[in-house]
Amino acid sequence: MHDARTFFMRGSCTYAHPVAIGRFFPLSSPTHTPQGTLMKSHGTMCSRNALLLPRRGAGLHVLTPRIREARPVNTGVKVILSLFATLVLMVGVFFCAPRASFAEFERHFYQPTVLSALSTNLREVSKASEAWHSRYRPLFSQFCALDAVRSSFDPAQKAEDITQRAREASALLSSVAGLKGVRIVEAQKPNIHFSTFESDVLLADSGSVTYRKYNAEEHDVPLQFLGEHSPEPKVIIDEYHDALLYSFPSLGNYGEYRGRILFYLSLRALGTHLIAENKLKITDSIVPLSADDYTFGGIVIGIPHEGVRSLKPSVLAEWKRKQFRVQTVRSEQHEDWALLSNASGAFVIAQAVPVLLFGFTPLTKGLVAMVAVVTTFLLVFQLLSLRQDPLTKLRDRLIHFHAQLLHSCLEQKESLEWEEVRTRLEHRRRETDAEMKKSLPRRLRIRRGRELDALLSKGWDDVFSTLEHGYGGARAMNRAQIEQLVREVLAQSLASGEAVLPVAMRADTADEELDEVLEELPDEAASLPSDSSPEEDLDPLEEVESIEGTAEESTREYAAAGDALLSKTPQLSTHSEYVPATLAELLGRNAEPGDVVRDSAVLEYIEGVFDYRPCCFYESHAVHDCLEVVTGEDGPSLSPMESIVSTEDGLFTIRVSKEEGNHLNRDFKALVDSVLY
C-alpha cells in the first residue's frame, strides 16, 4: 500500500503516486478540451499531465512533468571522441616505435625537402659561376692576340713592344676584378718571358728585364699539366695561389706553338660576385680542390680550409668517378658533413652542410608531434561532422517552404486579409508536415519523431504568433514583405535548434504515462471516491466547506510527509511576448463573495497563455482568507507583487479575491513575468 510519501522516477521527471493523489484529492471523470485532457474534482480543474500535491495551508501544489527530448550528438561529444581517437593513435605511434616513426618521417618527407632546397641553391650558384667565368674569357683571348704579346718569344725584342705589352697587361689587371697576374711561359724550357708578379723579376733596367725560372720554388703547376700543344684554353684549380688558372696557347707570328699564357684569377673575386648576386652568405668560404695531375678539380663552399684538407681524398674520388650524388664525409675533428656536387663547365662546385641539417632537432620533433596531434584531431572531427544533422536540413527547408507557401496563398491578391491567410495556412499545415516527415528516412522518423513534430510545430507557431501579435500591421503588408518577414522569423527561431514540444504532444505523452501508472495500481485504488460529477451543481458554500475540509486534512498528511516532496519539484520556466496591461484588465469579470472558481474557462485561459507549458498552480481562497493580501484600507488594491507569491523551485501561486474576479485572461502571463523576471 502506498502512502503520501510514495514517489517513483520515470525519465527525468518526478511523479507522485496516483494512490497518494487520490487520497489528497479525489479524481473524477476527465473532460476533453481543445488544449488537452482535463480532470475535474470538486469544482477545481487541472491538466491531465499535471499532478497535484498538498501544500501547507489551503490549496494544491501542482507538479508539472518535464519532457526531455532526444538531442543529436552535439559538438562537445564530437570533440571528446576526436580527442580520444587522437590520443589512442598518438600513443600507438610515438610510444610503440618513436625512433622509427621520426626516422621514416625524416627520410620520406623532411630530407627530400631539405635536399631539394640545397640542390636548387647549388644549381643557381653553378649558373652564376659559369656566367662570371665566361665573361672574362674574351678579354684573355684578346690579350693573347696582341702583336706585342706574340713577339715576347723573339730573341731581339723592340723597346716599343716591351712597353706596349706592359701597358696592355696593366690595363687588363685594372679592368678584370680579382686578376692577380699574367705570365708568359715557354713551352720547351721553364723560362718566363713576361710576368706581372714582382717575385718573378730577377733583374730589370731601362732596356731589358730578366725573370726567374718557372717552377723554381716547386709550387707552380708543372708545365706538362698546363695543356702543352693544346690549341684550346684550359682552366686549372691552383690551390697554392687560391685561384683559377687560365692557360691559353701562345702562337708565333707564323702560327707556330711557342708556349702558354697564364692568367691567375682569384677565387675571392668569385665569392664576392656570388655574395653580390645573393647566391652565398658572407660567412660562406670557398676552398679549391684539385687532383694531383690537375686533370680535374673544383671548389667547395661552406666548409673551413682545415676541414676540407682531410676530406680531399674521398671528395676527389667521387669527382673522378663523376658521381655527383650526396656524399657523407667525416673531418679530422670528427664532424660529419653532407656534400652536394654539381659540374659547372670547367670545374666542379660542391656545397658542404652539416649532417644534422637533415635530421630533426628536439624542438622540431616536439613541433612535428604537436602538428601531428592537431592534424589527427581535426581529421577525426571532420569525419564525425561529415554527416549533417537531418533536423538542420529540415530547418533549412522550412525557411524556404513557408515563404513559398505564403506566396501561393496570396498569389492573386494585392492587399492581404490576415484571417483568410491564417485559414489557408492552417488548412495546409497538417498535410505539409506529413509530406515533410515522409521525405525523411523511416529510422529517423521513429527515433526522433518528437523532435521532428516539435520543430515543425515551432516553425508554424512562431510565424503565426509573430504575424498576429508582434506585427499588427500585417494586413496592410504586401506579399514581398510577408515573405521576408517569414524568412527572418524562421531563421531566428529555428537557428537555435531548441524545439519545444507542443501542448498536444506533451499532454498525450503524460496521458500515456499516467495510464501506465493507473494500470499498476492495486485493487484498492479502484475503490477511491470518484462520484463527483462535473455536471453536478453544488451550492457555493457547500463547495467552499468541502474544499477547506479537504485542505485541512491534506495539510496534516502533508506535514507528516515532510519537506522532501517540495525538493522534487521541477522548475517551471516562462517567457512573455505580451505587454502587461492595467490592473483592472488582469482580473477580468467580478464574482459574488464566497464564490469558488470552478469554471473551465479558468484553465482554458491558463493553458492558452502557457501554450507549451499547460500546467500552473492555481490556489483559491475564500474572501476572509485573503483580505489582507488583496484589499487595502481604501478598498481593493490588487498589485502584482502582492497577488503573486513565488514558491519553491520556480512554481508560483496567485491569490485572487472573489470580489476582484474569478477569470484570468491572457495578460496573466505578463503579470507573472513582471514578478519572477
Curated annotation (Swiss-Prot):
For this UniProt entry, what's an example GO CC term? plasma membrane
Q: Keywords, A to Z?
A: Cell membrane, Membrane, Transmembrane, Transmembrane helix
Which chain regions cross the lipid bilayer? 80-102, 338-360, 367-386
Which domain of life, per UniProt? Bacteria
Chain spans, region Disordered: 523-556
Where in the cell is the protein located? Cell membrane
Keyword Cell membrane on this protein? yes
Give the membrane topology, semicolon-separated if more than one: Multi-pass membrane protein
Bias kind Acidic residues: ranges: 533-546
This protein is called Uncharacterized protein TP_0593
To which species is this protein native? Answer: Treponema pallidum (strain Nichols)
